[in-house]
């Protein structure tokens, strides 16, 4: 027998399974289960069950409840309603070989058996750094293993493809597959004391099916179930979120600038926050500030120089005015002295002229004091008093004119325009339209002699044949009779040469074409013109501001 077993062992291949090894594995598994059960389902003895409640069917053992524990108990699910939903995803508590609770089952729930799931810190350690790395074989697989894996992969792919091809085919079309007939030997049994029948051979064939027959059942598409949860990725434990992080993660709602169908009242800060413009950082170039500062500096310098020029111009005008007044004063004084000298020469002899002049001045001063009076001194005093009155009248006229100018400067624009329109000289057409040139209504001008029965009327031929005048009387005869007639106030004893000079120098008709007031110095500039009218060309920069700015900019550059 020993030789036979040795020969058989040499001929037969090595066994894949060993009974002794299986017995050893079964014993280890049973011990582990007993240890697991002992740890997992520990029931305290009677009398020490205060605070303990059965939570799983294993707590009841073979059956039977605990009467001293007053809770709802269902030993072996007896008395539980079948319609009630089961626990579902509840997992049974498991322990490791050391007795600790195994939480890896929670991570592996919903995954296939061979899928790699990181469930502990040990899974994160590389293989080369783990303990017992030498026990793991890192050799390449053999050809048999490669072929076996390839066959499994091929079968899996064929299964998937066949399923997809079957789904793509139409469901309504019936394709009958003819199978080979099956022959069955049928032997009837003896029933109710009947005689045995003979054996028969039955031929079973597939029943014919109408291909145009509509389907008998309604196929419903079952919705796809939820996918398996992704494997967990180990990360740091969660921490409390700060208020700043919550504010950063807060996303404002989308607010339209055009539509508000609900009619909500949205604050301006929320509307601006939804716009997103405040998130952009606005960067302002320094060149703008430098450019603005340079412009401000140049403008200030230009204003200062313009102000200085205006002050200098004002001072020069005042100085010129003072010089003119001084010159006029000197001319007036010289004329007064000349007049006084002529009066003294006409009253006394020619050889006593200087003495009489000096005496007249002394006597005039004495007459003001009230010492005595003389004929020549009285005449000089009369002339001085008349000149003084004229000067006083001129001063009053200037004062009235200054007051009028002051009132005009304080008037509004509309009132000043009305006053200027009122003072402006009107032509004949405007005066006729306004009724200002209406003649005095006399009895002679209100009637027409042609309407009466008289010898010179229309009945007698109106007038002579050789006369061409249309009207019997001139128009506005009363005013025209006094236009060029000298007034009664004029003195009859007038020097002819002096009167002629006065009439020629008088600007009597300037009001018809010129303004009442002229610009200062316009009389000196007026020159006699010969030929066509000439115009002055406009000056582009009368005050030289553009030239000054160009010079300043050229100096800076």
Swiss-Prot record:
Single GO term (MF): molecular adaptor activity
Keyword Phosphoprotein: yes
Region (Disordered): 1-32, 208-243, 316-444
Keyword terms: mRNA processing, mRNA splicing, Nucleus, Phosphoprotein, Spliceosome
Pro residues bias locations: 224-235
Subcellular location: Nucleus
Family per similarity comment: Belongs to the SNW family.
Function per UniProt: Involved in pre-mRNA splicing.
The name this protein goes by in its record: Pre-mRNA-processing protein 45
Taxonomic lineage of the native organism: Eukaryota, Fungi, Dikarya, Ascomycota, Taphrinomycotina
Gene: prp45
């Amino acid at each position: 027998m020993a030789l036979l077993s040795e020969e058989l062992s040499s001929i037969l291949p090595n066994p894949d399974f060993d009974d002794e090894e299986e017995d050893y594995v079964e014993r280890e598994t049973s011990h582990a289960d007993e240890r697991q059960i002992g740890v997992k389902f520990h029931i305290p003895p009677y009398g020490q069950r205060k605070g303990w409640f059965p939570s799983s069917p294993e707590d009841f053992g073979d059956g039977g409840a605990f009467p001293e524990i007053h809770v709802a108990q269902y030993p072996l699910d007896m008395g539980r309603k079948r319609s009630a939903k089961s626990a579902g995803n509840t997992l049974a508590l498991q322990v490791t070989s050391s007795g600790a609770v195994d939480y890896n089952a929670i991570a592996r729930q919903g995954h296939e058996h061979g899928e790699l799931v990181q469930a502990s810190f040990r899974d994160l350690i590389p293989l080369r750094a783990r303990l017992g790395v030498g026990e793991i074989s890192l050799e390449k697989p053999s050809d048999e293993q490669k072929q076996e894996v390839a066959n499994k992969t091929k079968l899996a792919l064929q299964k998937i493809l066949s399923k997809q091809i079957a789904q793509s085919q139409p469901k309504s079309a019936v394709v009958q597959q003819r199978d080979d007939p099956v022959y069955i030997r049928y032997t009837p049994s003896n029933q109710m004391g009947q005689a045995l029948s003979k054996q028969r051979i039955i031929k079973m064939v597939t029943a014919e099916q109408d291909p145009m027959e509509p389907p008998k059942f309604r196929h419903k598409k079952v919705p796809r179930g939820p996918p398996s949860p992704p494997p967990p990725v180990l990360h740091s434990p969660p921490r409390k979120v700060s208020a700043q992080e919550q504010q950063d993660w807060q996303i404002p709602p989308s607010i339209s600038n055009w539509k508000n169908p609900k009619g909500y009242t949205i604050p301006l800060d929320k509307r601006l926050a939804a716009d997103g413009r405040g998130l952009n950082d606005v960067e302002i170039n320094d060149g703008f500030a430098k450019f603005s500062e340079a412009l401000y500096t140049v403008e200030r310098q230009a204003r200062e120089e313009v102000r200085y020029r205006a002050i200098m111009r004002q001072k020069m005008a005042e100085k010129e005015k003072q010089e003119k007044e001084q010159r006029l004063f000197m001319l007036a004084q010289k004329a007064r002295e000349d007049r006084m000298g002529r009066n003294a020469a006409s009253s006394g002899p020619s050889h006593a002229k200087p003495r009489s002049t000096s005496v007249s001045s002394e006597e005039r001063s004495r007459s003001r004091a009230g010492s005595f009076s003389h004929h020549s001194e009285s005449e000089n005093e009369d002339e001085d008093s008349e000149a003084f009155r004229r000067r006083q009248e001129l001063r009053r006229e200037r004062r009235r004119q200054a007051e009028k100018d002051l009132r005009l400067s304080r008037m509004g624009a509309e009132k000043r325009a009305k006053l200027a329109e009122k003072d402006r000289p009107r032509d004949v057409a405007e005066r006729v339209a306004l009724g200002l040139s209406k003649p005095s209504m006399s009895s002679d001008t209100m009637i027409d002699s042609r309407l009466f029965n008289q010898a010179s009327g229309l009945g007698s031929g109106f007038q002579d044949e050789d006369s061409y005048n249309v009207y019997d009387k001139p128009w506005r005869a009363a005013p025209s009779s006094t236009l060029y007639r000298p007034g009664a106030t004029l003195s009859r004893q007038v020097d002819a040469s002096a009167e002629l000079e006065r009439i020629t120098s008088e600007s009597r008709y300037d009001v018809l074409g010129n303004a009442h007031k002229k610009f200062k110095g316009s009389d000196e500039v007026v020159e006699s013109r010969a030929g066509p009218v000439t115009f002055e060309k406009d000056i582009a920069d009368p005050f030289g501001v553009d030239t000054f700015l160009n010079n300043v900019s050229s100096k800076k550059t």
